[in-house]
């Protein structure tokens, strides 16, 4: 059986990478900080596909949400889209760059599967994201105590996410976290913890990749 290989950008705690490895996949992890088991430490904008030692079967991308978040986008953007801070300009450049890398991998491997993940916010409004199919998942539907509605763009038609939840749902056990509260995602200290992805979601995504890979062989 062919080994399935993937890349994980903005990896942080490697939620996706760990799930993939538990299913026997090979993973190349990228982050700008030297967290544990990061293979490439550096600015994604300075990368090219030759920095990855193989042509991947899949890629997961979790770019910085700071300038796209509902809470802070007015600090960084005009009309929620046009960048007005240097960091917003930088984030747009980085995201366009890794999307260009996705396009290169698709040329080399037409079966390349990608996922782009960001908390529900203004990234969905950006012009460079409009060509991708978007789903919205809620972390509480994957065993997390946070609701955290999250957008995921992908070309994998075999992945069917779980039904969405809603704020104040009496039938869900997620923490109630009005804006500014100390519960839910807002109560997690540091971006490292806030960015962790539920293992049930990671495994579901990776299993859909295995299914797609087997179907295409």
Question: PLM ranges: what are they?
Answer:
Residues 1-217:
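Conserved active-site and SAM-binding loop architecture
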